[in-house]
């Protein structure tokens, strides 16, 4: 089981690195993972992971060719659990930001709005794939963040 959790940690670190959109070669990814404590990582393993997770090379904001994970483009179905539409949850000092599958933000926002102030939600603003949520009076951003993580079964 220890190996399984080490593998999960590797996958989490790998995905986090690709979200940074600054690695232009597999060698750079290998070095970053080694610096993060994954000593046994090599280029062939990184290559397999890039393929497994559907990573592509694209231009970042600085117009550099970098590896990144493709946005989840799966179309939700009527039987898709809402938690599957939530890709990431983060927060700052003012609000909680929820990243969803494309087109799902308004559905997630409407569901959160229906929970109301008693659950800590003052209101939401939704775009296509992003929801901004602000806490109700008496609720901290951190408390709302944890509530949303639990509600959508996201990792703490």
From Swiss-Prot:
Biological process terms in GO annotation: L-arginine biosynthetic process; protein complex oligomerization; regulation of arginine biosynthetic process
- Sorted alphabetically, which InterPro entries does this protein's record hold? Arg_repress, Arg_repress_C, Arg_repress_C_sf, Arg_repress_DNA-bd, WH-like_DNA-bd_sf, WH_DNA-bd_sf
Which is one GO molecular function term here? DNA-binding transcription factor activity
Q: Taxonomically, which superkingdom?
A: Bacteria
Record-linked Pfam families: Arg_repressor (PF01316), Arg_repressor_C (PF02863)
**A single GO cellular-component term on record:** cytoplasm
Location in or out of the cell = Cytoplasm
Q: In which pathway does it act?
A: Amino-acid biosynthesis; L-arginine biosynthesis [regulation]
Give the record's keywords alphabetically.
Amino-acid biosynthesis, Arginine biosynthesis, Cytoplasm, DNA-binding, Repressor, Transcription, Transcription regulation
The protein's role, per its UniProt record? Regulates arginine biosynthesis genes.
UniProt similarity note: Belongs to the ArgR family.
What name has this protein been given in UniProt? Arginine repressor
Give the lineage.
Bacteria, Pseudomonadati, Pseudomonadota, Gammaproteobacteria, Enterobacterales
Q: Its gene? A: argR
């Amino acid at each position: 089981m220890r190996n399984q959790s080490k593998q999960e940690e590797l996958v989490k670190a790998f995905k986090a690195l690709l979200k940074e959109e600054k690695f232009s070669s597999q060698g750079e990814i290998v070095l970053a993972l080694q610096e993060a404590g994954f000593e046994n990582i090599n280029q062939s393993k990184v290559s397999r992971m890039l393929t497994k997770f559907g990573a592509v090379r694209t231009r970042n904001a600085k117009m550099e060719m970098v590896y990144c994970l493709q946005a989840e483009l799966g179309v939700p179905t009527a039987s898709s659990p809402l938690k599957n539409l939530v890709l990431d949850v983060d927060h700052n000092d003012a609000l909680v930001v929820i990243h969803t599958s494309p087109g799902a933000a308004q559905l997630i926002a409407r569901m959160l709005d229906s929970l109301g102030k008693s659950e800590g939600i003052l209101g939401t603003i939704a775009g296509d794939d992003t929801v901004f949520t602000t806490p109700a009076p008496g609720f901290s951003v951190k408390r709302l963040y944890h509530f949303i993580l639990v509600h959508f079964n996201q990792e703490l």
